[in-house]
Amino acid sequence: MADPAWWKLTFLKKKKSEAKVLYEIPPDFSNNNANKDLDHDAADSNLDARLEKIVATKSATKGRHVKVSHSGRFKEKKKIRATLVENPSLFPESAQTEKSHVEQ
């Protein structure tokens, strides 16, 4: 008789051979790490600054126009533009003509 759990095989995820790299370690830091003569505090702060810069450049533009709802779906943020009625200072000529139309 066939294996009763054959359907479980359809939901298995394929294992990836390599893990995703979340950050990059600069190559000169790994070379300097072998030398024990360096001041570790200065090297650590230098590495931290570089890692922060890498993360900031990669994640700065991702997901700014998208928000995640409670259900986990992505929703696009829409920019609300100000109308001319709310900001008459943008076009003073049109505001004056509107006032004259209202008065007549």
UniProtKB/Swiss-Prot annotation:
Pfam family, one: ATAD4
Ranges in a coiled coil: none
Family matches, as InterPro entries: PRR15
PANTHER family given in the database record: PROLINE-RICH PROTEIN 15-LIKE PROTEIN, PTHR14581
Name of the protein this chain belongs to: Proline-rich protein 15-like protein B
UniProt family annotation: Belongs to the PRR15 family.
